[in-house]
Design a protein with these regions (language model features):
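C-terminal catalytic "cap/lid" subdomain
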Residues: 33-342
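Accessible peptide chain termini
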Residues: 1-3, 32
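Polybasic, lysine-rich low-complexity intrinsically disordered segments
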Residues: 3-4, 26
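Intrinsically disordered, low-complexity repeat tracts enriched in Pro/Ser/Thr
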Residues: 5-6, 14
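Short, Lys/Arg-enriched N-terminal segments with co-localized hydrophobic residues
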Residues: 13-31
Length: 342
């Protein structure tokens, strides 16, 4: 088991200095050893439109292929906020044209987004691996995740989906019975329930493929939220937090590391203020302390740190790496990002 280390806060100019690199390399252990990892892709890895996604996944595929070449065994999960919102809007518009058409519920839209996003990632990564002479199966698994029907999240929706809307568009959403949240100076965004995940229904299928050293894309968008009703599974009108399911997936697969890719290069202390400073590493206790201090914003960095804490409490030999797509290659070598250890 790794020894806990005090958190390291560095200035931007120190991010690639030799001392910073040496410290992180020692904490990470032998980078050439085989590692089972869950990689969680954020919005930046996928874009917001079909065209943006097509271009973005090519860049994402190169970064993921780099990890495969470094002998990482990958299980990939991804965001779907913009995609599920786009699909839901399209299905709603279809209802306006065809009055007898039944609008697609959120769970169905989530299922569609898993296939849509998984298809692009799967094919782009497969092509990138083959271009490097690597023949490795890449598969997307439609994944359901059980939730508690009495989860308090159903009574207080907080999960943001889709792009910013004008006040007029927000009022239309409210009339439909949907929840919206205002962001001063930016506009409005739709919010839905984000219940906690209980069990990943298809975990055995995911585990079987992962143990066969195949690249697996699963739990897209947090998974399709379902409620158990005797032997049946009923879709829930909700979206599961992708970071929460990424942490659970890493626990269920007993992974060596959880890699969370986001819009920023690392975790920052006092983010957005004049005192802002990057955190190179922190241990589990320090992560909890930062959470209690309110250092991380809800809906952005907070769920990532909470997922890291949950994973490390259950897999004490593991580690969590938080960085951006741009710096992932340097981060896995200990030159960038934020490393969280037990």
């Amino acid at each position: 088991m790794r020894k806990s280390a005090a958190s390291i806060v560095v200035t931007p100019g120190q991010a690639f200095c030799p001392q910073y690199h040496d410290t992180r390399t020692k904490q990470r252990g032998n980078p050439m050893s085989k590692k089972k990892v869950v990689v969680s892709l954020g919005h930046d890895a996928l874009g917001y439109t079909t065209t943006e996604q097509w271009d973005a996944v090519k860049i994402t595929a190169r970064a993921l292929a780099d990890l495969v070449e470094e002998d990482y065994q990958l299980t990939i999960t991804h965001s779907n906020g913009p995609q599920v919102s786009m699909i839901h809007k399209a299905m709603t518009e279809l209802r306006r044209v065809y009055i007898d058409y039944t609008p697609a519920p959120m769970c169905v839209c989530s299922a569609m987004s898993q296939g849509y996003v998984g298809y692009d990632i799967q094919n782009s990564l497969r092509a990138e691996l083959l271009s490097r002479g690597i023949s490795k199966p890449v598969s997307t698994i439609l994944t359901q995740v059980t939730v508690d029907p009495y989860d308090e999240a159903f009574y207080e929706p907080t999960k943001v989906i889709g792009r910013y809307m004008s006040k007029e568009d927000a009022e239309i959403e409210i009339k439909k019975g949907n929840y919206v949240k205002e962001y001063p100076g930016k506009g409005f965004r739709r919010v839905v329930a984000a219940p906690k995940p209980i069990d990943i229904v298809e975990i055995e299928a995911i585990r079987t493929l992962a143990e066969a050293d195949q690249v697996v894309i699963a739990c897209g968008g947090g998974g399709i939220p379902v409620i158990e009703q005797q032997h049946a599974l009923k879709g829930a009108s909700a979206v599961i937090e992708k970071d929460a399911i990424a942490g659970k997936l890493a626990v269920d697969l007993n992974c060596d590391e959880l890699i969370i890719l986001t819009a920023v290069d690392c975790v920052y202390k006092d983010f957005g203020s004049l005192r802002q400073a990057p955190i190179a590493s922190m241990n589990l206790q320090e992560a909890k302390q930062y959470i209690s201090e309110g250092q991380f914003e809800a809906g952005t960095m907070l769920p990532k740190i909470e997922a890291a804490v949950d994973y490390l409490e259950k897999v004490p030999r593991g580690s969590v790496l938080i960085t951006s797509m741009k710096y992932i290659k340097d981060a896995v070598k200990g030159k960038a990002g934020t490393l969280i250890i037990p």
